[in-house]
Amino acid sequence: MSTAPPLATAWLVGGFGDACPFPTGSARCRVAAVSGPVHSCQRNRQQTASHQGRVQQGFRAMQVIGLCRFSYPAVGGFQVEHDSIEERIAYLYAEERMEERFHLMETVALPCLREQTDPDFTLVTLVGDSLPDRYRNRLEALVADMPQVQIVAAAPGRHRDVMKQVLNDARRNPDAPCLQFRHDDDDAVSVDFVERLRQTVRDCSGLIANHQTVAIDFCQGYVARLGDNGIHAALGHHPYFVAALGMYVAPGCRQTIMNFAHHRLARFMPTITLPDAPMFVRTLNGHNDSRQKGAKEPDLQRLDAAGLAEFDARFAIRR
């Protein structure tokens, strides 16, 4: 597994210069130590004054919106097929499955968001209006200490239509630009993910000012399996995974990150690819919807002490 450089050389992407602002040896300092620089895009494109002005004005206060689907019974959107919405609801709310989803939310999906170096973001957590009260109450208790989380309940509906509506409803000002990302309930992102999203927009302002949508892909990360015998993981280059994939949306644009299949974003808009540091963990578990068709198991290796320290510092995954 990768080893972080000496802590004395630590620095964090996001405008702090060469000095790490966090205590030496702290979790955030260790993340800073393994972060690499963001490569700036060229800024020599001609830009329209009105659009560029609106984009620049929105950089500092740009809203960042994440979408987490927590066992929402959508019509479509699953690779596991069901003959009726009732069958889908029964599958999603089965006790064994729900226990696994809560465990992954508690240990993987939420800790990394609690420790974001930039805590200014919104996480819309979409649930079904049929979610049993015991699960709704448990979810509310789980995120009670996270003011960023908004739990939204919706009736079953066409997957993409519901997701697009939820994201657009979450925009505080549709006439201002925003950044969007998806966050599955079994994945983690680096604790500087939101910080780096905003930094990338600033670095690539010339490109972004000329487009309605631009994808931002942090394409290096881990595939991992977490169990009683430790964490087994493989670091790799995975372009356009759901995890750590963001999208800029221009002022007034109603398109969302859910308008597009994540692996096809590059067909519809410019994309900024940042492969410099591990930015996500995608877990393998008993109910990975995207792995239901016999996907080949990657070559996972058990993390040693250095690997466990990186998962702790970078992703807030602790075992």
For each of these PLM feature ranges, what is it?
Residues 4, 16-22, 32, 37, ...:
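Short, low-complexity intrinsically disordered segments enriched in A/P/G/S/L with frequent Arg
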Residues 57-107:
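N-proximal low-complexity "stem/linker" segments adjacent to membrane-targeting elements
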Residues 110-120:
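Short, acidic, metal-binding catalytic loop of nucleotide-sugar glycosyltransferases
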Residues 121-130:
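Short beta-strand/loop segment that forms part of the nucleotide-sugar
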Residues 136, 145-178:
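Active-site-proximal specificity loops/subdomain of glycosyltransferases
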Residues 158-172, 190-264:
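Conserved catalytic core of nucleotide-sugar-dependent glycosyltransferases
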Residues 176-188:
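Short beta-strand-to-loop acidic/aromatic patch adjacent to the donor-nucleotide binding site
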Residues 238-319:
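C-terminal catalytic/acceptor-binding lobe
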